[in-house]
Amino acid sequence: MAMWPQSGMLTTGGRAGMQSAALAAWVANTKPGAQVFYLGPDYEMGRSTVAAFKAAAEGKGAKSVGELFAPLDNKDYSPFFGQIRSGKPNVIYTSVAGNDTVRLFSQMAEFGISRSVQVVGASGTVTGQNLAAIGKAAEGFVTGAGYSTLIDSPENKKFVAAFKAENKTDPDLYGADSYGVLFFYKAAVEKAKSTDTDKVRAAMRDLK
């Protein structure tokens, strides 16, 4: 749970800083002193997600060897590949998402960019919605997502089965987060024994 005291806002969803810290720790353990090239989409979320991971990674000894931001709905990533190769990274971090990920990963595989480089990225980069379209080009990709359908617990297995029965697809990170918000609110109401806003807010602060 994350909280912004000034506004009284609480959230059950993972934040870029949390996910970046976990992913940066993994990179530090597997690629000590990593040479990282950053490639993101050119808008606020893309840039802020890159910045969050960059700060976490450099805090653990990684070094930046380049940074590029592509326009949204970019069709051709090959013009960026020369600069990526020149940087000689052993890790590429990307915050590209959606259909852009399909094109990026397919083109990185086609041009041999991802053959000898570890590709890591934001939680929304490879999801259940675009994984089939990306196919084998997604193999080896690592992210710091806060949810997976593969979590081995009775609660998650029950959730995945119920979600799939209702929606005909597995839950992704956003489906799990949405469920988490409702479950969190329900638990707070039960703890407060009330739906009064102030009482529920107070109960939320103590929930684990």
What are these regions, as identified by a protein language model?
Residues 1-208:
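Extracytosolic ligand-binding ectodomains
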